[in-house]
Amino acid sequence: MSELILASTSSARRALMDGLRLPYRAEAPGVDEVVAPHLSVTEAVRELASRKARAVHQRHPEAWVLGADQLVEVAGEVLSKPVDRNAAREQLRKLVGHTHAIHTGVCLVGPGGKVLDAVETTRLTFYRVKEEELERYLDLNEWEGCCGSYRVEDAGQALLERLDGDRSNVQGLPMVTVVRLLREAGFRFF
């Protein structure tokens, strides 16, 4: 089987991939993450996942390369990674007491340019929390580098009232979908 490369430097994505116990390595894709404004959220994450996978695949054409991208959507607004604590506070205020969606695009590009891709959506509802609790959560700095300004795999799970879908999707990589794509590509487990 060809080498497997994760087109990401995300520690959360690497931790999820490590759980599969498949040999792989991670490499930064180094791509522009700006997409056309007319794209829907699901089209945008599909496009970005493809862009990341293809960028690394160009450097390693005989490998299978897995790319992923994630966006948070609440009330029709897309939330990306906050630039600072104030932006994180504003994002979290939009999420508390409401349901939002996490969309993750996954793209697997292989030898000969074979492409397998999918988009996974998970819906989450946050408790209504008081401003003081929100500030204490912000003090933990889990918002740094996270779409939506929280980490459900850490203390952010205490904000979570309900989750519908794949929990690993919320952490950055929908593993049920990833395993399906890897199996379709011919990867064997165990």
Swiss-Prot record:
The protein's required cofactors: a divalent metal cation
Biological processes per GO annotation: nucleotide metabolic process
CDD domains: Maf (cd00555)
EC assignment: 3.6.1.9
Record: active site: 69 (proton acceptor)
Keywords: Cytoplasm, Hydrolase, Nucleotide metabolism
Enzyme class, first EC level, given as a word: hydrolase
InterPro entries: ITPase-like_fam (IPR029001), Maf-like (IPR003697)
Chief location bin: cytoplasm
Keyword Cytoplasm on entry: yes
GO cellular component: cytoplasm
Subcellular location: Cytoplasm
GO molecular function, one term: nucleoside triphosphate diphosphatase activity
Catalytic activity: a ribonucleoside 5'-triphosphate + H2O = a ribonucleoside 5'-phosphate + diphosphate + H(+); a 2'-deoxyribonucleoside 5'-triphosphate + H2O = a 2'-deoxyribonucleoside 5'-phosphate + diphosphate + H(+)
Family the UniProt entry places it in: Belongs to the Maf family.
Role noted for this protein: Nucleoside triphosphate pyrophosphatase. May have a dual role in cell division arrest and in preventing the incorporation of modified nucleotides into cellular nucleic acids.
HAMAP family, per database record: Maf (MF_00528)
PANTHER family: BIFUNCTIONAL DTTP/UTP PYROPHOSPHATASE/METHYLTRANSFERASE PROTEIN-RELATED, BIFUNCTIONAL DTTP_UTP PYROPHOSPHATASE_METHYLTRANSFERASE PROTEIN-RELATED
Listed name of the protein: Nucleoside triphosphate pyrophosphatase
Phylogenetic classification of the source organism: Bacteria, Pseudomonadati, Myxococcota, Myxococcia, Myxococcales
